[in-house]
A protein has these predicted regions:
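Beta-strand-rich interaction surfaces with strong enrichment in secreted/lumenal proteins
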Residues: 54-55, 93, 125-127, 263-268
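Active-site/ligand-binding surface loops and adjacent short beta/alpha elements
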Residues: 147-149, 153-230
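Hot-dog-fold acyl-thioester-processing enzymes
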Residues: 45-87, 210, 222-245
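Extended, loop-rich substrate-binding clefts of extracytoplasmic carbohydrate-active enzymes
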Residues: 4-5, 79-131
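Acidic/His-leaning functional-site neighborhoods
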Residues: 88, 193-270
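Hydrophobic core residues within well-ordered beta-strands of beta-rich domains
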Residues: 124, 134-136, 274
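Beta-strand-rich N-terminal accessory domains
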Residues: 1-60, 206-227, 270-286
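Asparagine-centered strand-capping/turn motif at beta-strand->loop junctions
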Residues: 26, 138-144, 282
Length: 286
């Protein structure tokens, strides 16, 4: 099995994947995919060189799992940004290998600490299939006796050559909420080019593509179980106030996230489940 458990730091376990088709690293803290690099490709995910690896601290970059809320908690902004599951150690489940890649399963259930933050019983299963493409599926189950409503995201930081040579396609004509400054409802006209901070929630279940001229490749993100998608880049000023992000690294990534955000919230009755999933493929234009 090409999966090795080791420690990034004492008490901070990670899994390293060395497979003929792919290399990857996953932190047990947050079940956080830190690296996914298909053979023959540059790294597909951006990971901040200033990321903090401490229990209770979210990792900047890779694919954070945001749940059971996305963004600030609307009822209590003092609660952790983007929920709490990215800040907790998950349990490893079943791992397997095929000729084309590996499959890893991670599990998390409620406990006294999570119920202090959010008073509901739940079970989460995150499955990663890593190879030439990436597939991640977050299955959420209400294991309690009362309904609950969640928002969430698979917050993918995608590595690019240069923000000035990258565009995002597939959203022309789609309505979105622009959350930079005073929130406003807009409609996308053409592709997205980057010359300022972008933080938008799109009403879409379409595939979205990053056209990256800098690395001469396209990255296509396809979501399921989702009716919304977020496109984010912090740009210059916000990067300066994010302590775990180098000031100039805004030009190295674009976040295109499969989400259940804002109006796309999910309500689960007792015993019900929902799966939020994303698939990412890299192609080289001819």
């Amino acid at each position: 099995m090409p999966i090795l458990r080791t420690e990034l730091l004492p008490g901070y376990p990670i899994f390293q994947v060395q497979h003929p088709a792919v290399t990857a690293r996953i932190a047990l803290h947050g079940a956080h995919l830190m690296e996914w690099t298909p053979v023959g490709q540059a790294a597909a995910l951006y990971l901040s060189p200033q990321a903090v690896y401490e229990p209770g601290k979210a990792i900047r970059g890779g694919v954070p799992v945001c749940w059971p809320w996305f963004g600030p908690n609307t009822g209590d902004p003092s609660l952790p940004m983007h929920g709490f599951v990215r800040n907790r150690f998950w349990k490893p489940g079943d791992f397997s290998e095929t000729e084309t890649g590996v499959r890893l399963q991670f599990l998390l259930t409620d406990d006294a600490e999570t119920r202090r933050l959010w008073p509901h019983a739940f079970q989460l299963e995150l499955v990663m299939e890593l190879g030439a493409s990436l597939h991640m599926a977050l299955k959420m189950t209400n294991s309690g006796e009362v309904p609950f409503t969640i928002t969430g995201a698979l917050h993918t930081y995608l590595w690019i050559g240069d923000i000035h040579q990258a565009t995002v396609t597939g959203l022309d004509g789609i309505s979105y909420l622009d959350t930079v400054g005073t929130p406003s409802q807009q409609v996308q006209a053409g592709d997205i080019d980057f010359d300022r901070e972008v933080d938008r929630i799109y009403t879409t279940s379409h595939s979205i593509t990053i056209v990256d001229a800098g690395l001469a490749r396209n990255i296509t993100i396809s979501g399921s179980g989702s009716g919304s998608a977020v496109v984010w880049n912090p740009w210059i000023e916000k990067s300066k106030i994010l302590a775990d992000l180098p000031d100039g690294d805004y030009h190295r990534f674009i976040c295109v996230e499969t989400t259940n955000a804002r109006w796309d919230s999910i309500t689960l009755a007792a015993g019900e489940s929902h799966v939020l999933a994303t698939e990412i493929k890299i192609t080289v234009p001819s």
